[in-house]
């Protein structure tokens, strides 16, 4: 299956007047199932939607963001596979000299706090176009949070970015439901009941219902104890079965987190990982040496999602949930057979360390 279009000329060659969605990512375009933007774009494609890829746009000008014009349904925005600040800085707060998720290991091709910068640029250019945030950076910054690089509490990324919706955790279910409802003519402002999403509304517009109140942004800024209480409540409601809606005030606005999306079952995971990925970086990066991040995962196989561990140093349980779901043996074997047919295939694979727990 060919790569998804990355230029206006490619969309025109496909006979598109405009894409349904433009998926903006801070990583180079790698069509591989270990890259979140690849999964979401291929899944939407499988549902009949036209998706164009805008990888590492130049945020200092309008040119890249106007490449495809205004999409029919909206923009989906991700910083990429990791937080843009982690991509840019070491634990000593020093600027990194490389970026494995960029062509040729070249640093500086995405901005700091990428989802916020991208969303603001899109809002400036297309004020009425829906903007949906997703990916790790958006997901882990959805509440008021401590930022290591600022050494301060920052508000929800929804407050800073001005986006309409945020999908948190693994985003397949949410993305398809959002796409289907936008395609049916629902305004993005009405999409307030989708599991696995967050949104902002004026506090006075919130209709009371079963929910858990977190300490406000102002409270967590002023008190470490209130910050700890907020974090505990967020962790307590991460269960997809019993988790409740969470609320957190930011001034006159209210952040609403709907309960987590239900995890995909085995058959759904099989379908996701058997979508027609090209399983490598886009050929436009060939003369730059490709994208180094693919090297560790090119011949890997994802067997399961979720983790019961909840280790302090790891965000997997908070992002993927504690419920572990697995693919079928038949699906894993089909993928293994497919890998053996790829050029330069390594005829062995090993588990991720986290899967050995």
What annotation goes with each model-predicted range?
Residues 1-15:
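Short N-terminal or domain-adjacent regulatory/targeting segments
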Residues 19-25, 32-69:
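Nucleic acid-processing catalytic cores of prokaryotic defense/repair systems
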Residues 24-29, 288-315:
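N-terminal pre-triad scaffold of radical SAM enzymes
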Residues 36, 55-250, 257:
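Glycine-rich beta-alpha loop elements in corrinoid/cobalamin-binding modules
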Residues 153, 161-165, 336, 340-347:
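Conserved C-terminal portion of the radical SAM core fold
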Residues 268-277, 281, 291, 295, ...:
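Long hydrophobic segments that form regular secondary structure
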Residues 320-344:
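Conserved alpha-helical substructure of the radical SAM core
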């Amino acid at each position: 299956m060919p790569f998804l279009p990355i230029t206006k000329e490619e969309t025109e060659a496909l006979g598109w007047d405009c894409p349904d969605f433009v998926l903006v990512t801070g990583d180079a375009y790698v069509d591989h199932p270990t890259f979140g933007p690849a999964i979401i774009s291929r899944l939407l494609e499988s549902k009949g939607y036209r998706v164009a890829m805008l990888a590492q746009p130049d945020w200092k000008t309008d040119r890249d963001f106007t490449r495809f014009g205004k999409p029919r349904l909206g923009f989906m925005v991700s910083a990429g596979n990791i937080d843009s600040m982690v991509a840019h800085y070491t634990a000593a707060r020093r600027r990194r000299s490389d970026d494995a998720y960029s062509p040729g290991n070249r640093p500086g091709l995405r901005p700091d706090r990428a989802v916020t910068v991208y969303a603001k640029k899109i809002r400036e250019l297309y004020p009425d176009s829906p903007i949906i945030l997703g990916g790790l950076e958006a997901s882990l910054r959805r509440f008021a949070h401590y930022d290591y690089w600022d050494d301060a509490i920052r508000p929800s990324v929804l407050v800073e970015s001005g986006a309409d919706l945020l999908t948190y955790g693994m985003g397949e279910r949410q993305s398809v439901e959002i796409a289907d409802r936008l395609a049916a003519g629902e305004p993005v402002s009405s999409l307030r009941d989708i599991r696995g999403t967050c949104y902002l509304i004026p506090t006075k517009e919130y209709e009371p219902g079963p929910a858990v109140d977190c300490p406000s942004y102002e409270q967590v800024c002023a008190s470490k104890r209130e910050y700890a209480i907020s974090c505990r409540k967020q962790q307590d409601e991460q269960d997809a079965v019993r988790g409740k809606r969470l609320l957190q005030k930011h001034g006159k606005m209210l952040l609403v987190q709907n309960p987590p999306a239900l995890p995909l079952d085995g058959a759904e995971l099989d379908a996701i990982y058997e979508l027609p990925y090209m399983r490598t970086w886009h050929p436009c990066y060939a003369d730059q040496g490709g994208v180094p991040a693919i090297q560790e995962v090119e011949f890997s196989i994802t067997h399961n999602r979720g983790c019961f561990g909840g280790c302090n140093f790891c965000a997997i349980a908070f992002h993927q949930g504690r419920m572990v779901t697995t693919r079928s043996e038949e699906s894993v074997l089909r993928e293994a057979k497919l890998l053996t047919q790829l050029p330069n295939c390594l005829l062995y694979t090993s588990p991720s360390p986290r899967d050995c727990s």
